[in-house]
Every structure is written in structure tokens, then in C-alpha cells.
């Protein structure tokens, strides 16, 4: 959502942050790229200002920032953290032509009793499942699906089979929705 062409203008960077933009920056023809890997966090973060419908201003967001080490490398300021926004993730997958999707930082969510996952928005009184043109907070309210959290320490787990069932369910839900 920070891309100069496909992001939430004016809260964007000055360059293209998409897979196509990477091709341009590297001087590689897009038809030479076989696979586009999409890597996302198990929760959502945003640097700086701009719309962030799933931002959590309470303890959950603070916990994600602390456990996930979500602090700027130069300023040391905490990044804005919130629940996973599948609407934004689907948009990123679509715009980038993602062929394989990888989740990271699932361990940051260990210890939460419940998790919220945004599956759509209430936009001006209507339910939608796409990013609206005007995504300002006063126009958009996230629609959350609540899921069971997990308590397990994921350190040292190296296979899918070792993961707690609640995390597997979380992953499978994302796979189904995206």
C-alpha cells in the first residue's frame, strides 16, 4: 500500500514497491520472472501515517510491536501494529501477481487467547471485500473473524506437523481466503 501508483496516495513512497517495480529497478524483463514470492507477517504493520483499518491501539498492538521487535532501525519509533488484513493482503497478491505466499512472524502471535482477522470492510454502510478508493478511517470499519490463539513456544519447530493446531487452522484460513 506504499507503492506510488497502487498505494493509498498521498501516504506512499516515491517509488514502485511492486514486483514489476523490482524488475524495472534491476533491469530485468518481467517475462524472465517465473515466480513471484509474497512474504507477509502474521499480523499487519505500517510505517508512518496513512490509513490502517486494522490498527490496534490497545494492548494487543503494543504486544505485537514489542514481541515482533517492530521498531524503526533509525528512529527507534514503534511501528503501528494491528490484526491481519486479508483485504489488503489479497490486493497485494493481485497487484504483484504472487505465485507463492509465505507467512512469517507467526511466533509473535503466540500467547494471544484469541486473534482477529479482517475479512472485509463496512464501507459507508455496505459490506465490501476489496480496498475502497477512499480508505480513510471515518469511511471504513473492519469486519473481523475471531480465531483461537495458541500458547506454544514455536522456537525450534521446523516442520508444519510440529505447529499447534490453532496455528495450522490460522494458516489454513488464510490460504482459503486469499
Model regions: which residues?
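Non-transmembrane, aqueous-exposed alpha-helical and coiled segments at domain scale
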Residues: 1-178
